[in-house]
């Protein structure tokens, strides 16, 4: 397996909490990413949404688009509705030769609400889960046919958060549903990244390697933050 190293712009600014790094320019982000030796970077809120603007900007700093976040509402939308909504980002990623799209379900998510307790995140019962697995499989097959693999991102505060959620998703969906393994989110959810890696290596196409401060993790779990 060939591994290429990229970085995400959240290291400079946070799209969910714009007050964190909101005054950091896109140019500073790209320049420092390149200086650090990365060859790729994920898209972010400050990035141009048109390829004729984004490609020259990335080229200026010798960077490639290595993926980027797409927040879906596939639980509530039909597959056709979600296909229509994804078109602008799909075109951008295809134009930029991105190897995949990081895809996460955000319907009902609490990730952007600091007043919600972690335990109140949305969850699906068996009936809804079955319908969702069918829809995400159809969506993934569509994106695969478009040459843009869907790399599902388990994420805190969403319906696919824990190791158990992630395993069920992968075991009950088409092989075209690939995986973004995020070590920080998996640790926060008290799961085992290495087990996921070993059990589903054939589905893993993208990875987020993160650290978590132990004291902050323990406080968050204890106080349900």
Language-model-detected regions and their locations in the chain:
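Glycine/Thr-rich phosphate-binding loops of Rossmann-like dinucleotide-binding domains
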Residues: 51, 111, 217
């Amino acid at each position: 397996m060939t591994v290429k190293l990229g970085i995400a712009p959240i290291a400079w600014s946070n799209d969910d909490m714009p007050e964190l790094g909101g005054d950091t320019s896109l140019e500073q982000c790209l320049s420092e990413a390149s200086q650090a030796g990365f060859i790729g970077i994920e898209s972010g809120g400050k990035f141009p949404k048109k390829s004729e603007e984004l490609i020259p900007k990335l080229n200026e700093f010798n960077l490639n688009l290595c993926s980027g976040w797409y927040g879906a509402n596939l639980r509530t939308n039909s597959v056709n509705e979600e296909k229509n909504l994804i078109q602008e980002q799909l075109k951008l990623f295809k134009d930029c030769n991105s190897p995949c799209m990081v895809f996460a379900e955000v319907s009902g998510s609490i990730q952007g609400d600091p007043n919600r307790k972690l335990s109140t995140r949305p969850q699906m019962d068996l009936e809804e889960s079955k319908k969702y697995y069918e829809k995400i499989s159809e969506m993934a097959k569509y994106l695969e046919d478009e040459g843009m693999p869907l790399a599902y991102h388990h994420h805190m505060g969403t319906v696919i958060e824990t190791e158990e959620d992630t395993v069920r998703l992968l075991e009950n969906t088409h092989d075209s549903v690939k995986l973004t393994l995020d070590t920080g989110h998996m640790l926060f959810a008290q799961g085992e990244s290495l087990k996921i890696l070993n059990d589903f290596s054939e589905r893993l196409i993208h990875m987020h390697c993160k650290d978590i401060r132990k004291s902050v993790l323990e406080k968050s779990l204890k106080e349900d933050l």
